Amino acid sequence: MSNAELETAIEAAWEARDSISPATKGAERDAIEATLAALDGGGLRVAERQADGNWHVNQWAKKAVLLGFRIKDMEMQSGGAQGGGWWDKVDSKFAGWGEADWKDAGFRAVPNCVVRKSAYIAPGVVLMPSFVNLGAYVDEGTMVDTWATVGSCAQIGKNVHLSGGVGIGGVLEPMQAGPTIIEDNCFIGARSEVVEGCIVREGSVLGMGVFIGKSTKIVDRETGEFTYGEVPAGSVVVAGSMPSKNGVNLYCAVIVKKVDAQTRSKTSINELLRD
C-alpha cells in the first residue's frame, strides 16, 4: 500500500479504535502493521521538514503508533539478566535479527541499548547504552550517548550529539501536539532536556543542564528578547535565570551567542560555551 492508502486506512481505523483489539484481523490490522513497518524502516516518519523550514507532522502516523498498542497482548520479552525478561506489548527493533540484518542496517548498537519496534535508526548512528522509543527517527551520523533517551516520535537530525543522560521528550498525546525535534548538526550537552514538542534548530549548541519545555523562557542576551518553544539556528545556549516577582529569580535558557557553520567547524564546543 502507498502512504496515501495507508493514511486513509489508518484514519478509518482510528475512528473505529474502540473496536480494535488483539483479535482484529484483515485490512485494519494489515494497515496498522504496514505503517509501523514503514516507520521502522524509515520510509515514513512522523514529521518531515519542508523546504521553507517548517515541519509537517503526519498525525496519522502517530495514530498508527497508538493503534499498535491495541492489536497486541502483553507478552514476555526475553533478554533480561540471568535469564529474566520483561512484560510488554512492543517488541525490540532487533527481535529476530541476525548478522546480515545488522550489516544491512549499518549502525552500531552497544550492549544494553534499547530500541523499540517502529523507531528508525539510520546508517552511521552510534547507540551507547541508551533508549529510543517507538516511532522515533534518528538520522545519519548521530551519537546517542550513555543513558540518553529519545522519546516516542522524536525527530533527531544528522550528525547530532546527544550527550550522556540527555532526555528528548516523547509526544504521542495530545494528538494535535507536534514531536520534539533536534535538527541537523546540533550538540545537546550532558543531562539537558528538550521536551513538549520544542524544536532546536540546525547547528545549535546546548550547554550542560539546559532544560527547555514549552513554558521555558528562551532569552537572547544580546537583544533582551525572549521566545518560547524554539531555539533559533546556530544558537549557543546555557542555563540561566531571570528576575521575577518579590526578588525571586526563575529559570530560563539564555542564548549567549550565535555561530555559523564555519565557526562551528573551527571552534571546540567548550570554547563556544565560554563567556
From Swiss-Prot:
It holds the Pfam family Hexapep_2. GO terms for cellular component: cytoplasm. It is an enzyme of class 2 (transferase). Its main location: cytoplasm. Pathway: Amino-acid biosynthesis; L-lysine biosynthesis via DAP pathway; LL-2,6-diaminopimelate from (S)-tetrahydrodipicolinate (succinylase route): step 1/3. Keywords: Acyltransferase, Amino-acid biosynthesis, Cytoplasm, Diaminopimelate biosynthesis, Lysine biosynthesis, Repeat, Transferase. Its EC number is 2.3.1.117. SUPFAM superfamilies: Trimeric LpxA-like enzymes. It comes from the Bacteria. The keyword Translocase does not apply. It catalyses: (S)-2,3,4,5-tetrahydrodipicolinate + succinyl-CoA + H2O = (S)-2-succinylamino-6-oxoheptanedioate + CoA. GO terms for biological process: diaminopimelate biosynthetic process; lysine biosynthetic process via diaminopimelate. Belongs to the transferase hexapeptide repeat family. This is 2,3,4,5-tetrahydropyridine-2,6-dicarboxylate N-succinyltransferase. It comes from Roseobacter denitrificans (strain ATCC 33942 / OCh 114). The lineage of its organism: Bacteria, Pseudomonadati, Pseudomonadota, Alphaproteobacteria, Rhodobacterales.
